[in-house]
Amino acid sequence: MDPKKIARINELAKKKKTEGLTPEEKVEQAKLREEYIEGYRRAVRHHIEGIKIVDEEGNDVTPEKLRQVQREKGLHGRSLDDPNS
């Protein structure tokens, strides 16, 4: 997210605590917060999709649901053609 938008979120939060927001500012704040949260969720999802879990013996113990997502995206050498990957 653009640093200017983050600064605006913080500015509106501070103003809300000190003097309150106008109805227009409340709408702006809600839109900016939603945009920020959506970007954060995308980043976390992307990070989790890139994780491969192995046990102490080196065996892949990644949950099947995550493996399926990785197969669809071709991550970690997983392939839709090989259900054991």
UniProtKB/Swiss-Prot annotation:
Residues 62-85 are annotated as: Disordered. InterPro entries: DUF896. It is found in: Cytoplasm. Its main location: cytoplasm. Keywords: Cytoplasm. It holds the Pfam family DUF896. GO terms for cellular component: cytoplasm. Belongs to the UPF0291 family. PANTHER family: UPF0291 PROTEIN CBO2609/CLC_2481, UPF0291 PROTEIN YNZC. This is UPF0291 protein SPD_1303. The lineage of its organism: Bacteria, Bacillati, Bacillota, Bacilli, Lactobacillales.
